[in-house]
Amino acid sequence: MSTTQSERLRELLEPLVGSQGLDLEGIEVESVGRKRVLRVVVDSDEGADLDAIADVSRALSAKLDETDAMGEGEYTLEVGTPGAERALTEHRHYVRAVDRLVRFQLTEGDELVARILTVDDAGLDLEVPGVKGRKATTRRLAFEDIAKARVQVEFNRKDKKDMTEEEEA
């Protein structure tokens, strides 16, 4: 997909996605033989449920058909969310990941796995899990020190409600 087509699609679709209360996170056109697939990734601070995705999918489909932005050939439109282990690339992604465990690749080359506690314009306050029975520690991390960041899936984490109930018992 040329940059021009990508920019045109983003300009066309972003206001429509925004009007549905969602953020346009990504657009990808993939061609395999004669088949083309347009993948649109959406999200919001509250997450996007299936009804919201279906609504935005119908709106995008109508707009694309109306404008012929994908050209004459057939294509498949896929609309979805970023997934559980999403890469964090925008400030809003970090805000959405508060209380989540994240793997950071630092610009100095080190790797860090920590939970995001708070986010501000300059960086993050993190809780670094303790090693070998030690208590967790807090750490400040500036955005400029982050090369890459990706949310980690946790299968057995207690949520805040469970932790509060244990503390009260």
Swiss-Prot record:
BP GO terms, sorted: ribosomal small subunit assembly; translation
SUPFAM superfamilies linked to this entry: YhbC-like, N-terminal domain
Taxonomy, superkingdom: Bacteria
GO cellular component annotations of the record: cytosol
Cellular localization per UniProt: Cytoplasm
Keywords, in A-Z order: Cytoplasm, Ribosome biogenesis
Role, per record: Required for maturation of 30S ribosomal subunits.
PANTHER family on file: RIBOSOME MATURATION FACTOR RIMP
Protein family membership: Belongs to the RimP family.
Protein name according to UniProt: Ribosome maturation factor RimP
Organism of provenance: Streptomyces avermitilis (strain ATCC 31267 / DSM 46492 / JCM 5070 / NBRC 14893 / NCIMB 12804 / NRRL 8165 / MA-4680)
Encoding gene per record: rimP
